[in-house]
Amino acid sequence: RIISAVNDYHFIWEGRVHRVGASAGITLIDDNNHQAAEVMSQADIACYASKNGGRGRVTVYEPQQAAAHSERAAMSLDEQWRMIKENQLMMMAHGVASPRIPEARNLWLISLKLWSCEGEIIDEQTFRRSFSDPALSHAFDRRVFHEFFQQAAKAVASKGISIALPLSVAGLSSATLVNDLLEQLENSPLPPRLLHLIIPAEAILDHAESVQKLRLAGCRIILSQVGRDLQIFNSLKANMADYLLLDGELCANVQGNLMDEMLITIIQGHAQRLGMKTIAGPVVLPLVMDTLSGIGVDLIYGDVIADAQPLDLLVNSSYFAIN
């Protein structure tokens, strides 16, 4: 009935009637199938089958769909290269703010989305996991930074907002790529302090020299994927990075999970000792925001702070920051 109601809705825009459609994927939750990650994956696969079948479909998950989905997800090397070189790339901006002053936003985390050759939207992490050649990571990083400096850096500088872009471990390990990045930064109007780079925390151990080179140039470093493995703090020292970005899984249900609350409290203590700030998210519920605020987390992002929006829309709005 929900699907039918959406399909029957008449959306009028500028005097024209536009057709609205919806698709749905359904899976069974019972004693034998109750792991959240698995259930969500099944629902996603069923939903994909609905969208692939046409407008206004409802599909119930069946195991054979997973195999079919995996076959579709397996991209050829040529397709991967074509997506990096030619297909549309969208940068989505996620506002970051203190949970104690959620209205004050001047840092925006950037997530990436690409269009496949079949027109399907693929997020950065899913796309990177499909890479069958390390050179693809280098090429993807180059594409991201080239587009940012060519299309957005000037507007970002005029707004005075800080932008955080992802940099892969493979990209960080390439001296040529790091040098090219710094050259583009030097030739752009963007002050280096406004460019934040999101780097997996594990990279700090093997690529400390490259990270330090970026920091000395004025860039801010955000170490991501900080979660349940606290061994990283045996190697981290003060002035190695500026921020710690917590795993999303760690704060998703922190308001009702004492173990997660304790882990975040420990991470917060390490961050303070090292002179780094913590970032947690995505946060949807005000109750989660309040819990993180009580722990002392410095910054959060998610729907509770601001809806994600395309970077070009953000920099072309009337919003600006004093930074």
Task: Locate each region found by the language model.
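EAL-family c-di-GMP phosphodiesterase catalytic domain
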Residues: 7, 16, 94, 113-120, ...
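Active-site core of bacterial EAL-family cyclic-dinucleotide phosphodiesterase domains
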Residues: 72-130, 166, 301, 306-310
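C-di-GMP signaling machinery
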Residues: 30, 45, 49-93, 124, ...
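Catalytic core of bacterial c-di-GMP phosphodiesterases, primarily the EAL and HD-GYP domains
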Residues: 58, 108, 136-209, 282
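Alpha-helical scaffold within the catalytic cores of cyclic-nucleotide enzymes
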Residues: 1-13, 42-44, 144-154
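Catalytic-core segments of nucleotide cyclases and related cyclic-nucleotide turnover enzymes
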Residues: 14, 29-55, 125, 226, ...
